[in-house]
Each structure stands twice: as C-alpha cells, then as structure tokens.
C-alpha cells in the first residue's frame, strides 16, 4: 500500500476519506470488541480504531500489537464523539476506522518509554540513540536544527555567498586546543590533523578572489567537555572580502533575523545592541553577558572608601576594585547560611570572601553594616538599592571581581526565577583585547586567534607594547552564551609577522608552521573578515535545551565516547603495522 499522508497530519480536512498510514504503535487500549491504537510517525499521532463491527480480521491482528511495532493501515477518517475530542492534538477531532492492517515489523520491549518524559540515564539514551531519537521532543529539536540550516543556505545564497568545502585532512598547528591527529600510511611518521576550524582555508579563498564564502563546517577539538561542547561540532562559517566589521555585523544580523523568524516565528529588533568588551566586563562581569535581567555590577569604591572597613580600604589602596550586585527583595529571600553558601561558591573564582548588607527602612543590617552607618545613603545610591534588597560585595583585582560577581549574578537570577525563558536577547561584544593571559600556558595568547587584525590606531603598539592592543573582533552573544565570533583578518605579511613575534614565535618557528600561509599574503590579499556561528549551540538555544547533545543526532558523552558504537575502540595490530604505529598505554588506562 502507498502511504497517502502522515499520521500526524490527519485532521478534519480528511473526513470521510480513505487513508493509508504507516508508523509505530505508541500505545494500545483493548476494550474487548474495540481496540484503540495510537499510531506515531514523524509528524505526530493519530488514533486508530479497530472494531468487530467493521473488520473482525483487522481486530484480531490488532490484538497482537505491542508498543513500537511497525504497521501500515488503511481506513476511513471519521469524526470523534464530542466527549472523545482531544483539543491538545492536531488530530484530536478525528480517528481512523481501520479496514486493513499489516504488521511490517515487531519490536522487543524498549529499555525506556518512547515519550518526552522518560527516566533514563544519558548513557542509556546514547546507547539506544535510535530509540531516543524516536521521541517527539528529540524529533522537534532536530527539525529546529534543520530549519536553521535551510534558512542559512537560503539567506546566504540570496546574498551572493558561495558554499565551498574545505579539507578535513590538513596540517596540525600546535597552538590552542589539541588537534585530533590522523596518521598517514603513505608518509610514515607524518600526521594529518582534523581541522579545529576552516580559518586559514577560508582566508585563502578570499585571497583567491571568491569574495563571499560560507560553509556548514564540521570542526574537531580534543578538549575537555562540558554542557555546550563536543569533540566534533558544526559551525556556520562565513568569510567576506572588502567589508568592514560593521558591514559584517549588519549582514549577520540579517541572517539572525531571518533564522529567528522562519524557525520560531520570533521577530528580533535590529540593529542589535553593541557594547565594548570593557563595558561588558564592568557591567556584567562576563564577556558573554545575559541581558535578559538586570542586577548589573556596581562600582562601590567611592561609597566605601576610607570608611574603616580594612578589607575594602586595603584593596582600593592596592589598585583593586570593590563592586557589588543588588538582589531585589533578597533581604528576606536569603538567610545568613544561604549567603555563606554563596561565599563558598565564589571562592572557585578566586574571591576570598563575600561581604553583604541588607537594606531596611532604618538603614543597613549585616556583619559589615556598622562600618557604613554614616554611608548608608551613599551605598544605597551607588548600588541602586532600596528597602528589602540584599547587596553583595566582592573586593579584589578586576578579573576576580568580574568572574565572581558575574557568575554569582547568573546563579542568583536562576534561583530567583528572574530570567524570562521565552526571551531571546542578542548583544554584540566588540573591541576585544588582542591578547589575553593564559594561566595554562603561563603567557599571553591570542584572545581569538593569531590572524586577527589589531585596531588601526594600535598597529604601532604591536611592536612596542602588544598587550595594550585591541582587536577588530566581535562576538555575538545570545542569552549568556557565545553564539559566535569573528574579526577582520590580517591581510599583510608584515603585520602577520609582527603578530607571531608578539605571541613569542621565533622567526624560524613562524616560518615552519605558517610560512606557507604568509607566502600567500605576498600575492595581493584583499582586506577581509568574517565570523563563525555555532550551529549546535544556536539549535540548543532555539530548542530550549541545556545541552548541545540534545540537538545532535549522534553525539559523544561527557567522556568523549559513544555508547552506541563503543567508539573510540582499539584496532587490529595489522592496521597499526600499516601505519608504522605502536601504542604504549598505561595499564590503568587500558
């Protein structure tokens, strides 16, 4: 039988028509001479009716049905009785009286229910991912992802971008995250690397005159995982020639506006707000600020200076900061014990303590209130606090203050349900530092990557005082997540060489690793720039998920393994011999 429509699309317009449907048994209810079956497919669920009255043979077959059996049915669409109508379903006003049925395949009892609400561990879900993906919630998430990619293709094609693929097997660059390496059989002892991004290839395409490039690009990074990271991920990769940073941002806003409208029917306001990196750190304590709620960081230095509280005074004397966040209504919400728990929380960001006062009609209360009896109004004004609020202070250097209060701000907002989860708040963070200090490497590294162009007014500093340079770079942030980032690129060899020198490369090291690229810059590269948007993260946010695994068909778990296929795995000794490889694995890791 040829399928005539999808189960989830059968509604009143099919009344009195005969349909042929195919799908999975969601559930069965046996009332003796009457059996009801919910048939599920990619579009949804429709109710089937088997009756002794209109087909005894079909009823007998229906008695054999169990959950997840695959069936095809033929029958007539009829209206449900008034009391049987389900207003929550598209198909809720109709049902199909089945005249013919065939069981296409049987199914064992599944390890968890094929339903949105399930009680299963992440690894069990990944082990049986093909079952997990049957759940309507998962199908909806992947449909959102598909809608994003289709809209991206359409928008960029309309704007004269060329979809060009770049290599997966390329050269390792041992800067930044670890590469995934692929041994070469043809060149023993040599390795390809899977690309962490198509960065240099897309810049070469600009040098080749292709003007506007894009790619839905797979990228690979061998790094520790967290909720919004995977060892292999996908980005919407874009590069353009002869466009300024502002023009690239405007083009990106058009793309975001189209995606939001066509995916969720949400209108976003453009132009999107822009703030500098310095402003983001000062106001929100984060370079990816969530602007759906207030509770911004406030500089309390003037209000608390020389009031007699030694912690604050010594911090300010040593060039540090005293900042605070004001928790609306927090005076009654948070007990002393709960505030002490917050103090333990911020210690992970380097803070040594969390000072606090509660604002009352009579002034301030709390452990440090006695130092500020005469400053109560100054503190309330600086913190923008009113009676009933809780003011939380951190005193330290700029980074510790920003990190501590920035993370605390978000944690408290979640606890107090201050965040509108239906809101999509985009913001650009621009004018980044060109370099940032890495505690892991104990040196300065490129804040984005070493191919980022410094601001024009900072070009001289690249040779004399590079750590004061700012970059022509920009990040687009959505609801506190870095959705993507980009920059104007270096298109001149002399600037690229100066950049490598500032990063500590010797001339020989720069030539060995990137000489092939710098040689290309000698042949008339145009000014160019671009950005990359994280497709997985974008889909996660639009689908309302907390983990990108929920919008990837076959992801890895938090240990970078795949419970379904048991990857990574050992390989046959013959395969290693062909690659001239030997393994030396500690016993505890085997």
UniProtKB/Swiss-Prot annotation:
The keyword Nucleotide-binding applies. One of its GO terms (cellular component) is cytoplasm. This is Aspartate--tRNA ligase. GO terms for biological process: aspartyl-tRNA aminoacylation. Its EC number is 6.1.1.12. HAMAP family: Asp_tRNA_synth_type1. Belongs to the class-II aminoacyl-tRNA synthetase family. Type 1 subfamily. Signal peptide: none annotated. It is an enzyme of class 6 (ligase). Homodimer. Its main location: cytoplasm. The gene is aspS. It catalyses: tRNA(Asp) + L-aspartate + ATP = L-aspartyl-tRNA(Asp) + AMP + diphosphate. The keyword Membrane does not apply. The lineage of its organism: Bacteria, Bacillati, Bacillota, Bacilli, Lactobacillales. GO terms for molecular function: aspartate-tRNA ligase activity; ATP binding; catalytic activity, acting on a protein; nucleic acid binding; transferase activity. It is found in: Cytoplasm. CDD domains: AspRS_core, EcAspRS_like_N. Keywords: Aminoacyl-tRNA synthetase, ATP-binding, Cytoplasm, Ligase, Nucleotide-binding, Protein biosynthesis. L-aspartate binds at residues 175, 221, 448, 489. ATP binds at residues 221-223, 230, 482, 534-537.
């Amino acid at each position: 039988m040829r399928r005539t429509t999808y189960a989830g699309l059968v509604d009143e317009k099919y009344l009195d028509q005969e349909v042929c449907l195919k799908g999975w048994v969601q559930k069965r209810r046996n009332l003796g001479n009457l059996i009801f079956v919910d048939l599920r497919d990619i579009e949804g669920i429709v109710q089937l009716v088997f009756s002794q009255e209109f087909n005894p043979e079909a009823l007998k077959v229906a008695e054999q049905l169990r959950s997840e059996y695959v069936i095809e049915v033929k029958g007539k669409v009829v209206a449900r009785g008034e009391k049987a109508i389900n207003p929550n379903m598209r198909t809720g006003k109709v049902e199909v009286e089945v005249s013919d049925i065939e069981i296409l395949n049987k199914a064992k009892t599944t390890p968890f229910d094929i339903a949105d609400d399930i009680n299963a561990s992440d690894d069990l879900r990944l082990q049986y991912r093909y079952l997990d993906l049957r759940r309507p919630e998962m199908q909806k998430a992947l449909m959102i992802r598909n809608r994003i990619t289709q809209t991206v293709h359409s928008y960029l094609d309309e704007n004269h971008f060329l979809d060009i693929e770049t290599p997966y097997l390329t050269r390792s660059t041992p800067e930044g995250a670890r590469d995934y390496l692929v041994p070469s059989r043809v060149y023993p002892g040599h390795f390809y690397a899977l690309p962490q991004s198509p960065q240099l290839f897309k810049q070469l395409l600009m040098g080749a005159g292709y003007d506007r490039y894009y790619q839905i690009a797979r990228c690979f990074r061998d790094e520790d995982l967290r909720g919004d990271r995977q060892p292999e991920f996908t980005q919407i990769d874009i590069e353009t020639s002869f466009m300024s940073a502002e023009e690239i941002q405007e083009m990106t806003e058009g793309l975001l506006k189209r995606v939001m409208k066509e995916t969720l029917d949400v209108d976003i306001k453009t132009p999107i707000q822009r703030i500098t990196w310095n402003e983001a750190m000062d106001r929100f304590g984060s370079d990816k600020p969530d602007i759906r709620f207030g509770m911004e960081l406030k500089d309390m230095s003037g209000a608390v200076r020389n009031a007699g509280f030694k912690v604050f005074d010594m911090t300010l004397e040593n060039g540090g900061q005293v900042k605070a966040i004001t928790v609306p209504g927090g005076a009654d919400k948070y007990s002393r014990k709960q505030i002490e728990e917050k103090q333990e929380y911020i210690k992970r960001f380097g803070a040594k303590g969390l000072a606090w006062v509660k604002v009352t009609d009579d002034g301030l209360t709390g452990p440090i209130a006695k130092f500020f009896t005469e400053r109560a109004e100054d503190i309330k004004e600086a913190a923008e606090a009113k009676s009933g609020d809780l003011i939380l202070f951190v005193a330290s250097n700029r980074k510790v203050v920003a990190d501590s209060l920035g993370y605390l701000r978000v944690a408290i907002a979640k606890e107090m349900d201050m965040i509108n989860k239906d809101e999509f708040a985009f913001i650009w963070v621009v004018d980044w530092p060109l370099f940032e200090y890495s505690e892991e490497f104990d040196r300065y590294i490129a804040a984005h990557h070493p191919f980022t162009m410094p601001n024009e007014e900072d070009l001289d500093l690249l040779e004399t005082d590079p750590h004061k340079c700012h970059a022509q770079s920009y990040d687009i942030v959505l609801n506190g997540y870095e959705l993507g980032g980009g920059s104007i690129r270096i298109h001149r060899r002399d600037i690229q060489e100066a950049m490598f020198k500032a990063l500590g490369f010797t001339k020989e090291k720069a030539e060995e690793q990137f000489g092939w690229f710098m040689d290309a810059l000698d042949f008339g590269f145009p000014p160019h720039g671009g950005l990359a948007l994280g497709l997985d993260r974008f889909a996660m946010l639009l689908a309302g998920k907390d983990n990108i695994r929920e919008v990837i068909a076959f992801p890895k778990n938090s240990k970078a393994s795949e419970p379904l296929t048991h990857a990574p795995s050992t390989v046959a000794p013959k395969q290693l011999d062909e690659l001239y490889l030997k393994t030396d694995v500690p016993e505890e890791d085997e």
